[in-house]
Amino acid sequence: MQALIVIAHHDPDSLTHALAREVAAGLASAGHGSEIADLAHEGFDPRFTLADHAVHRGLAAPTADVLREQARIDRADALVLVYPIYWWSLPALLKGWVDRVFSNGWAFDYQDGVVTKKLRAMKVHLVGVAGADNGIFERHGYGAAMRVQIEHGIFDYCGAEVLSSNLLDDSEGPNAALHLRTARALGEQLFMPAHRQIA
């Protein structure tokens, strides 16, 4: 099995990148493959342009960079997003990737007021890296808001199934080693049947 691991962080020495490497290592140890899409290093342009708007309206085909990203996703058996949480949401680079890549005609069809979900086979795993602790997320409703926005608003809208959503909190505190172990375990268990996964 093959996973596409998408990273949206500008610093290759960040915890976010280290977590993505651990997910990949866990996958490899379980006999699976992975491809890492380092959006910052690859120079992906997250800006939604007039060309993207034309795609959304069904007036043009996606640009070459978007088609490449869609092909990467199509080749994968699972999609893993590893990202820092900025202002209680996805960073702009990753949000722009979603805006441009999950386009009308590929991720969904919208015609005459009817949405057809086209990514029903997609399995998604989310790894959000937060500086704040989980208590702040829950006390202010940020965790619930992110789940609605990302899991329901993006992936469910396209028919994709979010199999795991990990909030690795207090990332600037003493939990880095624990977070790395969590990421490794996620990779090891990514393609394991749910009833066999270790809690």
Predicted regions and their residues:
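N-terminal beta1-alpha1-beta2 submodule of the flavodoxin-like/Rossmannoid cofactor-binding fold
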Residues: M1-W106, D170-A199
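FMN-binding flavodoxin-like domain, especially the glycine-rich phosphate-binding loop
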Residues: R75, A92-G96, F102-A199
